[in-house]
Amino acid sequence: MKKLFKTISIILLTLFVSGLLILFFSPTPELLSDVNFSKAVYDDQHQLLRMTLSKDEKFRLYTPLSKISKELVEATLLQEDQYFYSHYGVNPIALGKALWQTYGVKTRRVGASTISMQLARIRFGINSRQVSGKLWQILRAIQIEMHYSKKQILEAYLNLAPYGGNIEGVGAASLVYFNKSVDRISLPEALTLSIIPQNPGKRTPQNHNLKHIRNHLFARWLVKHPEDGNKKVMFDLPLVMHTLKDLPFKVPHFTQQVLHDASITKQSIDTSLDSRTQIIVERITKHYLARKKMVGVFNAAVLLVDTRDLSVKAQMGSADFFNKQISGQINGIETKRSPGSTLKPFIYGLALDQGLIHPNTVLKDVPHSFNGYNPENFDYEFMGPIKAKDALVLSRNI
């Protein structure tokens, strides 16, 4: 039996060393460069207007490590890998303990995956529940440590870790669950996010034990940061989290224009749109349409621009983006259509410049026929003799 165990051990060690040598001379593995990310559009106060799905249907927003809450980074390491900066991809003590409890005494399955090992599993789709998969995961973790700094590894993990459903990475998770950028979250929110990747399927906003699990981590946090003891009152408050159905989808025509702008390549896009002004514009437009509904006006488009720098402050492409009866998804601002009465001031101005009329010139607002074409006014009526200035103000066509 001992001889068999020794033989198996030698074979496994040989395979492990061979695999390590192969990976050492293999090309550098990609961490984030070939990953497709979501895009997020913000207003002028950096409030989220819309976040898109990535090409593989994930909410995954790239966030550099420098833009991630330091408390979240530290809490994640406390929860997932306390010795992250001390090992080279594998924690041999934790791994040995896990192997003994899982396969030796067989009490319960214990995890011992480091941040690097978890990143390897996520990045390369490794099934780590099998022994062969676990060995491959270890080899890949060591390979990652060979080629990348701890900072790069941590950044990649925090951008790819699972946070429930199709939410990946702290950038998207923070926006979905707390409607905040990940550099603006509080300590309770940071600790809440840090406990989700360990069991993303169960640690959801609907889980009533989530607060208890988070507060247990806070107790460990206080051992390292006793100065945060005065924040305990924050952890006694109800844990309020949003879900994907609460994710903003505001000013859709405007955000579509921004997202389709080929010159914008970054994932997080700050715009000039003023959300407070946008709300006012939408309210005024809806009230106007409610008054004009009886005369057949059901749709409108509005563009509000700051003339000083031509930045867009508010925009409505239609009265209701989701209303099929008015073709609401068509952006009226971009649609080519007749200029209508827009040209009238210019025509009157040209006539004034050429001396053809003056403001008190009397014009005839009566029926005319031009080679079979019979123009009408918007009210289908004629006013007879009318001064030029009044004809312009009243938008007469004849």
Q: Which residues fall in each region the model found?
A:
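N-terminal type II signal-anchor transmembrane helix
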Residues: M1-D44, Y103
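Non-catalytic, structured segments within soluble enzyme domains
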Residues: L20, T107, G111-I279, R283, ...
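Terminal hydrophobic membrane-targeting helix
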Residues: F24-V73
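Residue-level preference for non-acidic, small/hydrophobic
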Residues: H46, T76, L119, I153, ...
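Short pre-catalytic segments that frame enzyme active sites
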Residues: Q47-L61, A172, N199, D261, ...
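Flexible, acidic/glycine-enriched loop-and-adjacent beta/alpha segments
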Residues: P64-I115, E168-A173, K231-F235
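Short, functionally critical alpha-helical segments immediately adjacent to catalytic or ligand/cofactor-binding
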Residues: E71-Q101, L154-A161, P188-I196, V302-T307, ...
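Surface-exposed patches in mature extracellular/periplasmic domains of secreted proteins
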Residues: F84-I93, V131-S132, L154, D228-V233, ...
